[in-house]
Amino acid sequence: MQTPLIDLRAIRKSYGGGDSPLVNVLRGIDLSIHAGEFVAIVGASGSGKSTLMNILGCLDRPTSGEYLFAGENVAELGSDELAWLRREAFGFVFQGYHLIPSGSAQENVEMPAIYAGTPAAERHARAAALLDRLGLGSRTGNRPHQLSGGQQQRVSIARALMNGGHIILADEPTGALDSHSGAEVMALLDELASQGHVVILITHDREVAARAKRVIEISDGLVVSDTACDLSAPRSANPAALQAVDLRKRLSEGSGSRGAWKGELLDAVQAAWRVMWINRFRTALTLLGIVIGVASVVVMLAVGEGSKRQVMAQMSSFGSNIIYLNGKAPNPRAPKGIITLDEVAALGELPEVKMIMPVNGGQAGVRYGNVDHSSYVGGNDTHFPAIFNWPVVEGSYFSEADEQSAAAVAVIGYKVRQKLFGEHTDPIGQYILIENVPFQVVGVLEEKGATSGDLDSDNRIAIPYSAASIRLFGSQDPEYITIATRDANNVKHAEEAIRNLLQRLHNGKQDYELTNNAAMIQAEARTQNTLSLMLGSIAAISLLVGGIGVMNIMLMTVRERTREIGIRMATGARQSDILRQFLTEAVMLSVVGGLAGVVLALGMGAALLLSKVAVAFTVPAVAGAFACALVTGVIFGFMPARKAARLDPVAALTSE
């Protein structure tokens, strides 16, 4: 004897229990259905027929009893295998049509094929052919609200047939239709039955049930009658119908839906875009958090990087081969060490030293006419422009003869020129008072800019070392020594040679201090990096707020689209498919927000550049901020997506 395609044994289904009363909906159903049968299950409202249909269609599980499908115990199947059965074996036709409102007729029909991994061209052609066969060839692009009830039900039937529809489960298919549309739907079901499909019709209307070849009546959760209206043998089964012998193999091969992810991803992206467009205002408010977050991170990092590059360029312009030598106290109670001019001469003889220059200077008051200014005044020798790569742009630097004669001449920095003389007065040849001592301006240094913080290299005046010692400070000993090494790549070696010589000259006393420009540049770079990190971290808080907004909107979306989730599950979507669907939508929000944030950041950066603010956009910073937006979408979209994936199919389908 042929194995029944569907075999129910003592099926019971109960709800409630615990704190709520126990309700027994099915009280022990025994039922067998063979391939090729057209069966009507009839009963009054509350008789349990819809619950039975949900169990038959693998949307729900019985409380007890045994359900064998093609010889396989359904209770032993996992969630992915049940999804495969819903996708490949069953086709649902619901009383309320259950079409996705935002999708066209063709997109609704194609849904089961997407989850089956059918190639796009093949599923487009099959969906169009099914709709044309059902008289909807001209309505493929219409949304459900643009179709009549009968047309929507025909779309539902086409969807049920998309993957073959070996077993058609029709729950009150004519209940919401007028008599003419109802007759058309029943004629379609008759035709499907005649082609060998198993048709299981759930209805309370005995006239509708009479169209079937077998009528099973249910009352109070029990089968009260099982009548064959046509004693002839069942029609031959659909040639593609599932057979017991290969079901387990097909389940193991097909439950993974290999290749389906591409179609699902495209479907998820299209669905996400439709939902975003339909709820444009809400989407814009949600995106605002991501946009502001990404823009803030990018701009903050760009400002930090711009400031860093500016400072590094200015510091590097003084030369990375520079070493500074200062006297210092070896301990808190000892006097500060002194570097003499004789020691300067000895250091200048080292082969590692290219040039050496003593500096005797300090902050001093400067006046020209009735304009007062405070500036650093440094007594240097003629090596100053060469050591610091600092050319004179107006006039000339003082000469060796000026140094020998302690001439009262001065070369002023760019900022000093601006403060004392403005744009229109030629400073060359003019006399300024430095601590009330007159000095003639012979040159103006090129603009360098501030190196760090409030230190402005352009706010300085260079005078001969001898003039500084005699005319201003009254001391021959230098304030500090500037040393230019021969090899910029081996400053450490030169520093070691200088330290060894000073150890001998100072009899081993550590009353001096050596610092080099390269180390200062590295330290400043670390400081600037820390500042940039701090700015980026502050800005990232707004991105976090944007992520919370994404999670909020996705939770609302899951709640609003609970029925859609149920529809997708009924057409064969696995939990992982639903998870991917809603996770993709969350990422889509983040992608759009991230792109808009990057564009906004570039616009803000352009505005800052016009305002003379140092800004430097880097690919890692922009890509990193965008990647953070994507990660934010994944992290904050995961919980809503997981919630959607865990919904019960029956509860989702019946939600309002």
UniProtKB/Swiss-Prot annotation:
InterPro entries in alphabetical order: AAA+_ATPase, ABC3_permease_C, ABC_transporter-like_ATP-bd, ABC_transporter-like_CS, MacB-like_ATP-bd, MacB_PCD, Macrolide_Exporter_MacB, P-loop_NTPase
UniProt keyword Cytoplasm, yes or no: no
Class of enzymatic activity (EC top level): translocase
Main location: membrane
Sample GO molecular function, one term: transmembrane transporter activity
Described purpose of this protein according to its UniProt entry: Part of the tripartite efflux system PvdRT-OpmQ required for the secretion into the extracellular milieu of the siderophore pyoverdine (PVD), which is involved in iron acquisition. This subunit binds PVD and drives its secretion by hydrolyzing ATP. The system is responsible for export of newly synthesized PVD after the final steps of biosynthesis have taken place in the periplasm.
Family listed: Belongs to the ABC transporter superfamily. Macrolide exporter (TC 3.A.1.122) family.
Entry protein name: Pyoverdine export ATP-binding/permease protein PvdT
Annotated source species: Pseudomonas savastanoi pv. phaseolicola (strain 1448A / Race 6)
